Curated annotation (Swiss-Prot):
A motif (Nuclear localization signal) lies at residues 88-90. The keyword Ubl conjugation applies. Its main location: host cell. The lineage of its organism: Viruses, Monodnaviria, Shotokuvirae, Cossaviricota, Papovaviricetes. It is found in: Host nucleus. GO terms for biological process: DNA replication. This is Replication protein E1. Keywords: ATP-binding, DNA replication, DNA-binding, Early protein, Helicase, Host nucleus, Hydrolase, Isomerase, Isopeptide bond, Nucleotide-binding, Phosphoprotein, Ubl conjugation. It comes from Human papillomavirus 72. Its EC number is 5.6.2.4. The modification Phosphoserine is found at residues 94, 98, 109.
């Protein structure tokens, strides 16, 4: 075998000295013509071995050099996925937020999931209330964790900050998504207060949380006002999400604007919750209270429940009374009377039963004969008069009102029947506070060309009810003031009006039964025919029989009657039998008016009072007047229908 160039094969000892003969000696390569030697192959250059330092990696695996880079890549991937998921929240739900059933189906049978024609998208339902972890009632705030998972969406805290996203849909399935608030978690608060205020039905959420904190429903303490403009002096305010410093300061800040304040403070994961019963110095509406409390507590108006309290509820009053005695409440001012009345034993024992005679006496003293007016006016005394309060607490208010008006009418009818016309005029005059000027009446009579002496003589016989002289007729064209003159006199004397339009009824004359003076306004030709046929006795002033509804026929002396008409019955021979029964006065001139439409001559109760006081001697005589009323006023005892207190022996 030929020897290879550059290789020596030894034998014997020479082979032993040469590592057994298998080691190959370095080959010698000759350089070709034109070859340029590089700096790396320069044999003469000094080699220090620096280029071979990292030629072989001798480091052990697991030193953690690649771990930060790998984690950074994973973290960026998660952040990118979360950002994309947040942008897609208004559209079809992504697989990351799809239901658990869809994920399980796609993972167990991917081939079946791939060939499905229409994927059913389950509508995401937002929880109305988050599950409480049990740490919500502590006053110490706990820092937020680094990573939170809520509703299938992951909240991570990266190197650049914290990103929160929440995918919500309105309750009721309308398909509209609400924008989620992105807030930064802070270690000072255990949970974000604004999370609860993103729901669509905020009031239901607040009512539920109120019941959890205070142990009873908010509706048990309040009555609802539908209008925000309704005025009330007492208000129940429950504010959520109040800062701790503000909650402590409100006990002092609210004192200048209210007369009474009952404040309770509770804590939850949303922050401080304040329940207040406030009595303001003046009545306020819900809008005013909301604006005032929003400024005072530094919270939005939507975070408050504002309604008036139940002032007639015993359990409600007892709740405020018992909680005010505990150390968990701050109370300022005097306790409202509706709480004291329903809780304190002394006030409860002082409550008396309703007395009908007291109601009748009150209606008689105030000259009330209308049921609606009596019910309204007496109900307004519920906070002042104990009998009125017992009346409001009764279930027979309508019956009491009807009975009281009936008795009041009986008393007044009997009182009127016992008085003569002179006494009645004096009685009506005492009801008028001021005294006017009788010259207004005299000037008006002169303006209508009516002799004052003739009128006074006819009025004297008219008021006395002299037969054939107890009917005064005022004749003239329209707009001459006939009705104005007669109506003003009738109002002062407290008379009654009858209308010919009701002549078809048997009871159209029944108002004359309870009146001292009557008036038939604007009698037409047909009315005069009816009077000439059926009412000649009425014009005479003699006793007549009047039919009343649900009553027997009543026989009485007909009161004096005034008639206004545009027809002169004295000129018509068809009414010749009425000529001797009436006294006629002509008003031929139109009533003058001021620029504002008021009459130039004022005919009111004050002027009629002055008229009768100054001309009393011509009508009745001075002796009877002096007996009726002396210088110190009326000497008659006032009517009393309530039982007095009788002194009984011990």
């Amino acid at each position: 075998m030929a020897n290879c160039e550059g290789t020596e094969r030894g034998d014997g000892d020479e082979d032993a000295n040469r590592a057994g003969g298998w080691f190959l000696v370095e080959a010698i390569v000759e350089q070709t013509t034109g070859y340029q030697e590089s700096s790396d192959e320069d044999e003469n250059s000094e080699d220090r071995g620096e280029d071979l330092v990292d030629f072989i990696d001798t480091r052990s695996l697991g030193d953690g050099q690649e771990v930060p880079l790998d984690l950074f890549v994973q973290q960026n991937a998660r952040d990118d996925a979360a950002t994309v998921q947040a942008l897609k929240r208004k559209y079809t739900c992504s697989p990351a937020s799809s239901s658990c059933v869809s994920l399980v189906d796609s993972e167990l049978s991917p081939r079946l999931d791939a060939i499905s024609i229409n994927r059913g998208h389950d509508r995401a339902r937002r929880r109305l209330f988050d599950q409480d972890s049990g740490y919500g009632h502590t006053q110490v705030d706990i820092g937020a964790p680094e990573s939170q998972v809520s509703g299938g969406t992951q909240h991570t805290k990266g190197g650049g900050g914290a990103v929160q996203e929440a995918e919500e849909e309105r309750v009721g399935g309308d398909g509209e998504a609400q924008c989620s608030a992105q807030t930064q978690q802070t270690p000072e608060r255990a949970a974000d207060v604004l999370e609860i205020f993103k729901v669509s039905n905020l009031r239901v959420t607040l009512l539920h949380k109120f019941k959890e904190l205070f142990g009873l429903a908010y509706g048990d303490l309040v009555r609802q006002f539908k209008s925000d403009k309704s005025i009330c002096g007492d208000w129940v305010v429950c504010a959520f999400g109040v800062y701790h410093a503000v909650a402590e300061a409100v006990k002092t800040l609210i004192q200048p604007i209210c007369l009474y304040a009952h404040i309770q403070i509770q804590t939850c994961q949303w922050g401080m919750v304040i329940l207040m019963l406030v009595r303001y110095k003046c009545g306020k509406s819900r809008e005013t209270v909301a604006h005032s409390m929003s400024t005072l507590l530094n919270i939005p108006e939507k975070q408050m429940l504002i309604e008036p309290p139940k002032i007639r509820s015993g359990p409600c009053a007892l709740y405020w009374y018992r909680t005010a005695m505990g150390n968990g409440s701050e109370v300022y001012g005097e306790t409202p009377e509706w709480i004291v009345r329903q809780t304190v034993v002394g006030h409860a024992m002082q409550e008396t039963q309703f007395s009908l005679s007291t109601l009748v006496q009150w209606a008689y003293d105030n000259d009330i004969t209308d049921e609606s007016e009596l019910a309204y006016d007496y109900a307004m005394l519920g906070n002042e008069d104990p009998n009125a309060a017992a009346f409001l607490a009764s279930n027979c208010q309508a019956k009491y009102i009807k009975d009281a008006i009936t008795m009041c009418k009986h008393y007044k009818r009997a009182e009127q029947a016992r008085m003569s016309m002179t006494q009645w005029i004096a009685h009506r005059g005492r009801k008028v506070a001021d005294s006017g000027d009788l010259r207004e009446i005299v000037k008006y009579l002169r303006y209508q060309r009516v002799e004052f002496v003739t009128f006074m003589g006819a009025l004297k016989l008219f008021l006395k009810g002299v037969p054939k002289k107890s009917c005064m007729v005022f004749y003239g064209p329209s707009d001459t003031g006939k009705s104005l003159f007669c109506m003003s006199l009738l109002k002062y004397l407290g008379g009654a009006v009858i209308s010919y339009v009701n002549s078809g009824s048997h009871f159209w004359l029944s108002p004359l039964v309870d009146a001292k003076v009557g008036l038939l306004d604007d009698a037409t030709y047909q009315c005069w025919q009816y009077i000439d046929t059926y009412l000649r006795t009425v014009l005479d002033g003699n006793a007549i029989s009047i039919d009343r509804k649900h009553r027997n026929l009543t026989q009485l002396k007909c009161p004096p009657l005034m008639i206004t008409t545009n027809i002169n019955p004295l000129e018509d021979q068809a009414f010749k039998y009425l000529h001797s029964r009436i006294v006629l006065f002509k008003f031929m001139h139109k009533c003058p008016l001021k620029s504002n439409g008021d009459p130039v001559y004022t005919l009111n109760n004050e002027n009629w009072k002055s008229f009768f006081q100054r001309s009393w001697a011509r009508i009745e005589g001075p002796d009877e007047q002096e007996e009726e009323e002396d210088e110190d006023g009326s000497t008659s005892r006032p009517f009393r229908c309530v039982p007095g207190e009788i002194a009984r022996p011990l």
